[in-house]
C-alpha cells in the first residue's frame, strides 16, 4: 500500500487503519512524498461509534484495537455521546436467548433497519406568524460587504453594536444564539417588539435553554410580557447507529438578522462574560450574502420546537398534528421494511424548506423527532398523556422542586430553583414561599389565561372585532355607553354616515327654517303644509330629519324640500302625480347629489301649471318667505347647476302672471339661495338680507290679486348659489353658464 520505507514499515502500515497509517507517515522526517487528499467515509470510525453507543466505552476501545485504528474520540466527545444517547427497541426474550454476538447485532439490524433514517411526516412546519419581510432588491443584487469587529477593540464594543442595531430595526429581528443570559439585550429586544411593534424571533440552543429560563425567572417574565416575540428551541443533527441508538448534537450557530438587510455573525454569545471578559469576534455583513442567512433561519425555524410558557399564540399543550407511532410498534415480522445504507440519507437537509410554504411535509425523526434528551416537552402530548407517559408537566416540576424528573432541561436548574441562593431572596423564584406576589401571580413562566384575539394581516378586521373584548361575543358591551341599533357590529364608516345628519342639524336649523314652517303651515313661509295623513311607510319631516339612518340624510331633506317647497297650492297636482314625484325623489338618493339639483328646475317647471288667479292664496308669497338652504359643497354641483338658472318659470316654480312682471326684474334685487355652509359670514349675510327685505317691503300685499309691482317676481326668481369663495369654482361656474344640459329624469 505504501511503498518506500522497508518491509517492517510496510507491514505495520499495511495493517493499520487509515488514520493511524497517515499519522505514522507524517511522523517520518525523511518522507517527502505527499499523500493525495482522500475524502471518504471511514468504516472503522462508524463501527467504533456504534459500539460506544450500544455497549459503552469498553466496546468502543475493543473495536478500535481490532481495527488497528487510533482512538479518535476525545473524553469530551465520549462524555457527551454517552450522556445524550437514547435507546432503541429491544429484542424479545426468546430472540435474546437464541442470539448472541454478531447474530444479535444482525437481528437488531433487521428489526430497526427502517428506522436508521428519518421517516416522512405530515406535520406542518411552524409559520412565521408575526410577519417576515422579503429581502430588498437592493440587498439581493448588491455585492457582499463585510466589516469585522474584535472584542479586543474597546472602541467598537460588540454589545454596543448589537444594541444599536436592535434600536434601529424596523421590520424584523431574528436571533439564533446558543446561550442567552444578558438582561440588557433582552430588554432591548422587548422594547423593539412591544414599543415599536417589530417582530422578534428567538431560536435558542436546546442544551442551554435552561439558562434563558432562569434569567426570565429573575426578571419575573413570562409569555404574556412578550406578545410580539416568539421563543423557540433548536438542536443539531441526530446521529443514529445501526442498532437504532441515537443522540442529538448541539446548535452552535450564532447570528443576528436585522430587517433582512444586514447580518451580524461570529463567536459572540449573549452573556455578560462575553461582553466583559471573553474574547470573541463578529462579522457585520451586507449585500447578497444576507439571502443565505435568511434561508438558513427559515430552515432552522422549521426544525425548531416551541418553548413551554413562551410559545405565544401556539399552545404546546395541545397537539398541532399527530406524530407517527413509536418505531418498535411500526415494524412487525409480517411487515417488510426497506433498507438503505446510503451515507447521504443521514442528512437532515431534506427538511430545510421555508416555513411559509403551507401544507408542505418535511422529514421528522422517528418517535417524535424531538430533542427529548435535553428537555422541552414535545408539543404532540397533552397534559394527561404526558403524565401517563412518565413526563411530568412543567407546572408540576416548578410547583414541586423535589419531584423527581427525568434527565432533561429542568432537572438541574428549574426543578431545584428553591435551593439556589438567589431564589431565597426573590419571591417570584421561590415557589415554596407564600408571599402575596407568588400567590397572586403564580409561576412567572406559565402564561395566564386570557382571551386570544387573532388578527389576519392585510384584512379588514374592524367589523369582526368584539366590542367587549371577548372573542365569542357579538354583542356590544353595555358599559361602553354606546347605542347600536341591532346585534350586528357597525364599522366606523357606517357610524359616520349615521352621525352626519345630526351633525349638520345645527346648520339646517340656522339657515333653513323649512321643515318647521312646513309642519305648522306658516302663511308667510311660502310652503304648502302637508295636510293629508301620512302613508304607512312615511314619517313626519322632522322625524326624517332626526333619523340616524342613511336614507334620512341631508339628501332626503333636499329632495323633500324641493318636492314641496315649490308647489303653489295643494290641489295643483293630482294624487297620482304626487305619488309619482315622491317615488322619483326617493330614487334620487341613489343617483347622487348633482342629479337632484339638475332634476329639480326642469321637472318642477314642467309639472307646475300657470295660475292666472292666485287671489285664493294671497299670503303664500309674503315678504317673509323662508330661504331653502341645502348644504352641498361639491364641485360637480356648481358646474352642473349653473345652466338651469334661467330655464323654466323659476327655481321655485311660481307662476308668471304677465309679461310686465319680467320687465322690471333687476339683478341687484334677486335673492340668492345659499346652500348650507356653516361659515359665520353666510349666516350674517342671511340675517342682514332678511332684515333689509322686511324693512323695504312693509306694505307688501297681504291679500287680493298680485299685480302691484315687480318685487314679487324678483323674490320668486332666486338663484341657487353654492357659496364658495374660491376663484376656480367661480370661473367654472361662469364657463358652464351657457351649456345646455338635460336631466336624466326629464320626460
Curated annotation (Swiss-Prot):
Gene3D superfamilies: Endonuclease Chain A. Phosphorylated in vitro by CSNK1A1. One of its GO terms (molecular function) is protein kinase binding. Changing residue 259 to A: Diffuse cytoplasmic localization, loss of localization along fibrous structures, possibly due to loss of interaction with CSNK1A1. Its main location: cytoplasm. Keywords: Cytoplasm. Residues 322-352, 374-412, 462-484, 517-550, 588-633, 646-672, 692-715 are annotated as: Disordered. May interact with RAF1. All members of the FAM83 family of proteins share a conserved N-terminal DUF1669 (domain of unknown function 1669) domain of about 300 amino acids. This domain mediates the interaction with casein kinase 1 (CK1) isoforms. Therefore, it has been proposed to rename DUF1669 the polypeptide anchor of CK1 domain. May play a role in MAPK signaling. This is Protein FAM83C. The gene is FAM83C.
Amino acid at each position: 500500500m505504501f511503498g518506500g520505507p522497508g518491509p517492517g514499515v510496510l507491514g505495520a502500515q499495511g495493517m493499520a487503519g487509515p488514520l493511524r497509517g497517515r499519522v505514522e507517515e507524517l511522523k517520518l522526517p525523511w518522507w517527502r512524498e505527499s499523500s493525495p487528499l482522500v475524502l471518504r467515509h471511514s468504516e472503522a470510525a462508524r463501527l467504533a461509534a456504534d459500539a460506544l453507543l450500544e455497549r459503552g466505552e469498553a466496546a468502543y476501545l475493543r473495536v478500535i484495537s481490532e481495527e488497528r485504528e487510533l482512538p479518535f474520540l476525545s473524553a469530551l466527545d465520549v462524555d457527551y455521546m454517552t450522556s445524550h444517547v437514547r435507546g432503541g427497541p429491544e429484542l424479545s426474550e426468546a430472540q435474546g436467548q437464541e442470539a448472541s454476538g454478531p447474530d444479535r447485532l444482525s437481528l437488531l439490524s433487521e428489526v430497526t433497519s427502517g428506522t436508521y433514517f428519518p421517516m416522512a411526516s405530515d406535520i406542518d412546519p411552524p409559520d412565521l406568524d408575526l410577519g417576515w419581510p422579503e429581502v430588498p432588491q437592493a440587498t439581493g443584487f448588491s455585492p457582499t460587504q463585510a466589516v469585522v469587529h474584535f472584542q479586543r477593540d474597546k472602541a467598537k464594543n460588540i454589545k454596543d453594536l448589537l444594541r444599536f442595531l436592535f434600536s434601529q430595526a424596523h421590520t424584523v429581528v431574528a436571533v439564533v444564539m446558543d446561550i442567552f443570559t444578558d438582561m440588557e439585550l433582552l430588554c432591548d429586544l422587548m422594547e423593539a417588539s412591544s414599543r415599536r411593534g417589530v417582530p422578534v424571533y428567538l431560536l435558542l440552543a436546546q442544551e442551554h435553554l435552561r439558562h434563558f429560563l432562569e434569567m426570565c425567572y429573575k426578571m419575573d417574565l413570562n409569555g404574556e410580557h412578550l406578545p410580539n416575540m416568539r421563543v423557540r428551541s433548536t438542536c443539531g443533527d441526530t446521529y443514529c447507529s445501526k442498532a437504532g441508538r441515537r443522540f442529538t448534537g448541539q446548535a452552535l450557530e450564532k447570528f443576528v438578522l436585522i430587517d433582512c438587510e444586514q447580518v451580524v455573525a461570529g463567536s459572540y454569545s449573549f452573556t455578560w462574560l462575553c461582553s466583559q471578559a471573553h474574547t470573541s469576534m463578529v462579522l457585520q455583513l451586507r449585500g447578497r450574502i444576507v439571502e443565505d442567512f435568511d434561508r438558513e433561519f427559515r430552515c432552522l425555524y422549521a426544525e425548531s420546537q416551541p418553548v413551554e410558557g413562551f410559545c405565544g399564540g401556539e399552545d404546546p399543550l395541545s397537539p398541532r398534528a399527530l406524530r407517527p407511532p413509536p418505531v418498535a410498534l411500526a415494524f412487525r415480522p409480517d411487515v417488510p421494511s426497506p433498507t438503505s445504507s446510503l451515507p447521504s440519507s443521514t442528512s437532515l437537509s431534506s427538511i430545510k424548506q421555508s416555513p411559509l410554504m403551507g401544507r408542505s411535509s418535511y422529514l421528522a425523526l422517528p418517535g417524535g423527532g424531538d430533542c427529548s434528551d435535553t428537555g422541552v416537552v414535545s408539543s404532540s402530548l397533552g397534559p394527561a398523556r404526558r403524565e401517563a407517559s412518565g413526563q411530568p408537566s412543567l407546572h408540576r416540576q416548578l410547583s414541586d422542586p423535589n419531584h423527581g424528573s427525568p434527565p432533561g432541561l429542568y432537572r438541574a436548574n428549574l426543578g431545584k430553583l428553591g435551593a439556589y441562593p438567589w431564589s431565597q431572596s426573590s419571591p417570584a423564584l421561590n415557589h415554596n414561599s407564600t408571599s402575596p406576589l407568588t400567590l397572586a401571580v403564580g409561576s412567572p413562566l406559565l402564561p395566564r389565561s386570557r382571551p386570544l384575539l387573532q388578527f389576519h394581516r392585510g384584512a379588514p378586521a374592524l367589523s369582526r372585532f368584539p366590542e367587549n373584548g371577548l372573542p365569542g361575543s357579538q354583542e356590544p358591551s353595555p358599559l361602553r355607553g354606546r347605542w347600536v341599533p341591532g346585534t350586528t357590529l357597525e364599522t366606523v364608516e357606517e357610524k359616520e354616515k349615521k352621525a352626519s345628519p345630526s351633525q349638520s342639524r345645527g346648520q339646517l336649523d340656522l339657515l333653513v327654517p323649512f321643515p318647521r314652517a312646513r309642519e305648522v303651515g306658516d302663511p308667510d313661509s311660502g310652503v304648502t303644509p302637508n295636510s293629508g295623513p301620512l302613508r304607512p311607510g312615511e314619517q313626519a319631516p322632522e322625524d326624517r330629519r332626526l333619523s340616524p339612518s342613511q336614507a334620512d340624510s341631508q339628501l332626503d331633506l333636499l329632495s323633500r324640500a324641493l318636492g314641496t317647497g315649490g308647489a303653489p297650492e295643494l290641489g295643483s297636482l293630482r294624487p297620482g302625480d304626487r305619488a309619482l314625484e315622491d317615488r322619483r325623489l326617493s330614487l334620487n338618493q341613489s343617483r347622487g347629489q348633482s342629479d337632484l339639483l339638475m332634476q329639480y328646475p326642469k321637472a318642477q317647471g314642467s309639472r307646475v301649471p300657470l295660475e292666472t288667479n292666485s287671489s285664493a292664496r294671497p299670503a303664500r308669497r309674503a315678504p317673509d318667505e323662508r330661504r331653502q338652504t341645502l348644504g352641498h359643497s361639491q364641485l360637480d354641483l356648481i358646474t352642473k347647476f349653473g345652466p338651469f338658472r334661467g330655464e323654466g318659470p323659476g327655481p321655485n316654480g311660481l307662476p308668471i302672471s304677465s309679461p310686465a312682471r319680467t320687465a322690471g326684474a333687476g339683478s341687484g334685487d334677486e335673492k340668492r339661495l345659499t346652500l348650507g355652509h356653516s361659515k359665520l359670514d353666510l349666516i350674517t349675510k342671511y340675517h342682514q338680507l332678511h332684515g333689509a327685505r322686511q324693512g323695504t317691503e312693509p306694505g307688501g300685499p297681504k291679500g287680493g290679486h298680485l299685480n302691484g309691482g315687480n318685487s314679487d317676481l324678483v323674490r320668486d326668481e332666486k338663484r341657487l348659489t353654492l357659496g364658495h369663495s374660491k376663484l376656480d369654482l367661480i370661473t367654472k361656474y361662469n364657463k358652464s353658464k351657457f351649456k345646455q344640459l338635460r336631466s336624466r329624469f326629464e320626460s
